[in-house]
Amino acid sequence: MLADRNRSAAARSVAPRVVIIGAGFGGLSCAYQLRRAGVRVTVLEARPRLGGRVHSLDTLLPDKKVEAGAELIGLNHPTWLAYAKQFGLTLHELPDSDGAHSPILLNGRRLLGEEVAKLWSGLDTVLQSMNGDARTINRQQPWLSPEAAALDAQSLLQASQRWPGSPLERQAAMAMIANDMNAQPERFSYLAMLASIAGGGVEAFWTESEIYRCASGNQSLALALARAIGEAHIQLRSPVAAIDLTDRAARVTLHSGTVLEADAVVLTAPPSTWDALRVTPALPADYRMSTGTAIKVLNRVDHPFWTAAQLEPDALTDQAVGMTWRGGEPPARSAKEPACLTVFAGGQAAQAWLDRTPAQRRQLANQELDTLFPGFSRHTQQQIFRGWPSERYTRCGYSAPSPGQVTRVLPRLQGGWQDKLFFAGEYASPGFYGYMEGGLNSGALLAGRLARRFNLVDVQRN
């Protein structure tokens, strides 16, 4: 992040102007760092709220925040941790899960006990087999890695043919990755997978990437950043219609007709939404990263009924219910109070939910969750479905680079377009696709590059 010591923009006759499109974590992080450097910043957000794909709900469980979007934070997410410390946000570590009591459902068969404990262990061995390739990857610029083009040309499915382990272990590993990376394995770049593993610290990627939740809800970080930026610099309900880069100053036109001029424009909205933007000169296709599909189903139950059967709420399947865990912060004080069983599905599993009506989704949830956690349908009280690909200003889960895109698209995103349009967000963060860290980190890094471009500040390396 940018250091406090800086050459103030006041030394310039006129401070540079930057318009940032999107008030998700990427946009807010970039705006906050640029404001500290003395840049005149305007953040435009189409929605009536801050946070983008981070949305903390307080209506499902009493006195708790439940995440309808991005949820888990890693010990290997330095920007998130730095902001949490700076703004006084408490992070709670998730309890360890006992593999023997965390069900896996594969090929229609529910596994428990010693069989599932052995499968969890074997699954881990399969995943760790990619670490050797990941150690060769340049974390900041994976397209410069040895054999980058060849690794990028491979799909994850092709690379998986070299995995060790039994067929069942490989199937479980692929189910986990397909959900986590919201990807279809045959359409997901192997280099993108390796870049994520490398960015997370190789071995640490598997053990430290999803271990914390924010006690006050992840959206509290968005609010903290917004307060630091200043309310006057953020405009909600302000969708952008066009970006014109042909003159000396960039011009951003809102749907309302308002026109803003800027020395630079930062686009943080996901690439899946760019069809709604008219960019002049037109943005080449090689700037657009592929995105995947992800959904969440938040199920309020009358109490954590699974404990009576000595089950953990963490599960993995090869069906529509991709993965489950217990949601809600702060942690429960009583075993009798209502709880949230969260379903997360990515890739093909997510599509199964999106293709159904609300009534069909409820039926699907009851059917599959009753298999994993017998009695679920008797205990469920409320269900909230969040289909991010159906949300107007999102249209996706998160980035899922196709074969060839890491070496082709990422260098272009890092370089910008027409020397005026720049990019930040998880889609522009090769080490943290799909994570909040991707937005926060890419926003802060871009702010540093722009500050140097404007001759404003030095950069403090995290």
For each predicted feature, which ranges?
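FAD-dinucleotide binding site
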Residues: 1-462
